[in-house]
A protein has these predicted regions:
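Structural preference for solvent-exposed beta-strand-turn elements
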Residues: 1-278
Length: 278
């Protein structure tokens, strides 16, 4: 929605807490004449990193603590500087879940920023996963010998991210007793649980936003599962890693949207998987 204030020529953009739209609005308005206020802006780590990048290039961007970002027009940006891109905290969180379930003892994850992972680490610890801070953006995640069923509710940063509820559901499937997922931000993002049922997971979809998982489940392979969602596809791979027998996961192209060299990284850590072209 565009709300033009003709007295100050200030353009106010009211938006949802979406990461991509926030990033696009910031970039689109840096060199656009006038001042822009982006309301309900996302503040995820990669949004903050984009702002830091643009500030290094002499952009005039201010952040308010009520999810407002103010972009003031500049005539030109610098193109002569160096900048470090932050690691993806969703990718780091995915690997934390994988190693809690599938590692032999523990694994160290480098370039994992603790502040970005707070909401994830707290839920892993609540589920009895041991996580150690080795400092200098390095984490040690231990294989879980037992897991506690817990409730997760997705939310905007810094709370538990919607992009990790699918992988976390696989961890919940191995926990004792009942776990609950409450997906606040999206409808029908829990549909991947229908695919998980093919692997003999005991789940119940309550409504488009809530589901129960009754554990622990001994997942079985010899089935074909699919996904039309990047994070659900990662969840299916995690389920395959801990399941008995071979599993086939289709729509592999989705994984490349959010994970760098995902298959080979798992193979380097002794996962027995192969990408095939049917």
């Amino acid at each position: 929605i565009l709300d033009w204030n003709l007295k100050t020529w200030e353009k106010i953009l009211n938006w949802g807490f979406w990461v991509s739209s926030t990033e696009n609005l910031i970039v689109a308005n840096v060199l656009r004449p006038g001042n822009t206020i982006i309301k309900s802006a996302a503040i995820e780590p990669h949004v903050m990193n984009l702002i830091s990048f643009l500030r290094t290039a002499w952009a005039d961007i201010k952040i308010r603590y009520n999810h407002e970002i103010i972009v003031t027009w500049v005539e030109k940006l610098s193109d002569n500087f160096e900048f470090d891109i932050v690691s993806d905290y969703i990718e780091a969180g995915t690997y934390m879940i994988i190693w809690a379930l599938a590692s032999k003892e523990y694994i160290d994850i480098a370039n994992a920023r603790i502040d970005d992972l707070y909401g994830i680490i707290e839920k892993l610890k609540e589920a009895w996963v041991k996580v150690e801070d080795l400092w200098n953006d390095k984490l040690r995640v231990f294989k879980a010998t037992s897991l506690k069923g817990i409730q997760i509710q997705t939310n905007i940063f810094p709370w538990f991210p919607t992009d990790l509820q699918s992988p976390f559901a696989i961890l919940q499937s191995q926990a004792d007793w009942i776990s609950k997922i409450h997906e606040v931000l999206f409808e029908w993002r829990l549909n991947f649980l229908v695919e998980l049922e093919k692997m003999r997971a005991n789940v119940a979809l309550i409504n488009p936003h809530e589901a129960l998982i009754f554990g622990p489940n001994k997942l079985k392979g010899w089935v074909t599962v699919t996904s039309w969602d990047l994070r659900a596809w990662a969840a299916m791979i995690i389920a395959w890693l801990i399941a008995e027998w071979e599993t086939k996961v289709t729509n592999v192209e989705y994984i490349y949207r959010g994970y760098e060299d995902f298959i080979n990284k798992l193979k380097n850590l002794w996962a027995d998987l192969e990408e095939v072209n049917d």
